[in-house]
Amino acid sequence: TPEHQRYVELFIVVDHGM
């Protein structure tokens, strides 16, 4: 689902921020 993809992208951004 598109919503899941959005969460995945957000998680990646947070991971890179860490």
Swiss-Prot record:
<keyword id="KW-1199">Hemostasis impairing toxin</keyword>
<protein>
    <recommendedName>
        <fullName>Snake venom metalloproteinase Bfon25</fullName>
        <ecNumber>3.4.24.-</ecNumber>
    </recommendedName>
</protein>
<comment type="similarity">
    <text>Belongs to the venom metalloproteinase (M12B) family. P-I subfamily.</text>
</comment>
<keyword id="KW-1015">Disulfide bond</keyword>
<keyword id="KW-0479">Metal-binding</keyword>
<comment type="function">
    <text>Snake venom metalloproteinase that impairs hemostasis in the envenomed animal.</text>
</comment>
<dbReference type="GO" id="GO:0005576">
    <property type="term" value="C:extracellular region"/>
</dbReference>
<keyword id="KW-0106">Calcium</keyword>
<keyword id="KW-0378">Hydrolase</keyword>
<dbReference type="GO" id="GO:0046872">
    <property type="term" value="F:metal ion binding"/>
</dbReference>
<dbReference type="GO" id="GO:0006508">
    <property type="term" value="P:proteolysis"/>
</dbReference>
<comment type="subunit">
    <text>Monomer.</text>
</comment>
<keyword id="KW-0964">Secreted</keyword>
<keyword id="KW-0482">Metalloprotease</keyword>
<dbReference type="GO" id="GO:0090729">
    <property type="term" value="F:toxin activity"/>
</dbReference>
<dbReference type="GO" id="GO:0008237">
    <property type="term" value="F:metallopeptidase activity"/>
</dbReference>
<keyword id="KW-0862">Zinc</keyword>
<keyword id="KW-0645">Protease</keyword>
<keyword id="KW-0800">Toxin</keyword>
